[in-house]
Amino acid sequence: MPKLKTHRGLAKRIKISGSGKYLRKKAGKSHLLSGKSRKRKRNLKKTVIVDSTNVKAVKKLLPYL
């Protein structure tokens, strides 16, 4: 079997927690921020766990991470 290629775009966006869960940043924090409330912008800073429905796809794209 040949080596599997890592999806580099996704590898730059995902980190793995100590317990093995995949972490990602929230979208919507780059521009057009004046129309968003402080609370909304503050909550967009947080990292979240990748949803269980997407974990299988992430594992396939990141075979060695």
Swiss-Prot record:
Task: Please give the Pfam families that the UniProt record associates with this protein.
Answer: Ribosomal_L35p (PF01632)
Give the matching InterPro entries. Answer: Ribosomal_bL35 (IPR001706), Ribosomal_bL35-like (IPR021137), Ribosomal_bL35_CS (IPR018265), Ribosomal_bL35_sf (IPR037229)
Listed GO MF terms: structural constituent of ribosome
Which keywords appear in this protein's UniProt record, sorted alphabetically?
A: Ribonucleoprotein, Ribosomal protein
Q: Which GO terms describe its cellular component?
A: large ribosomal subunit
A Gene Ontology biological process in which this protein takes part is:
translation
Q: Does the keyword Ribonucleoprotein apply?
A: yes
Q: Does the keyword Secreted apply?
A: no
Please report which protein family the annotation says this sequence is part of: Belongs to the bacterial ribosomal protein bL35 family.
Return the HAMAP family for the record: Ribosomal_bL35 (MF_00514)
- Which NCBIfam families does the UniProt entry name for this protein? rpmI_bact
Q: Indicate what this protein is called per its UniProt record.
A: Large ribosomal subunit protein bL35
Task: Tell me what organism the protein belongs to.
Answer: Caldicellulosiruptor saccharolyticus (strain ATCC 43494 / DSM 8903 / Tp8T 6331)
